[in-house]
């Protein structure tokens, strides 16, 4: 039992540290991240788990080898397509429920921080079930595929949350839905593709590669949103990574033109101003 507890604590500390590390300029409070991690993870894992179970009963599908029910390719495809969308939907819904009116949600990077925290919480609760059923070996394997998968997928619909708040006047469902579909599709590929592999090592390698690419995407996106956010006092070139002043129009090193997804620059003082705001929040000039 002690090794279980230590393993989970180390995992939680590591992934929370990863999430906080790339929220570079205005760190979210640890207690708020842990709140999203625990409450959001618990809510989403319970609701998604209930609907997963109901759907498996509806189509008479059992994933466990030797269990009653059929496990044909067709039913597997249908079930994992449902699971992919279902789990991403409830993780996204729990995140919006928790943060949409939060005062600390004051830059686009925060959407990714809390989305990834909720998704990590989801993966921890999910891993408890797998570890109790299959043993500690499954826990360690899932640290290299399932956990980064959930965190990486959260960055996809986390982008939708950021765009809903900062570009679409808080129309969360309409804005997020396409991103949830994309995340659900990758989740489906992760779950279903290994069933088509002829070699056991390929069925383990493929999900790990997918998870690695997704977590790499998530970290890059979080880093970019943080660097482009209102609390950064410089512009970072996406092409050569050179820091530039807030007044820069092009990179001083490579000449790449700057483009901010959520902000425009005040020509008077260089402040990054929300696209939905007509005047600079710092000097009052029209932008």
Task: Write out the residue ranges for each language-model feature.
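Hydrophobic alpha-helical segments at protein termini of multi-pass membrane proteins
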Residues: 1-286
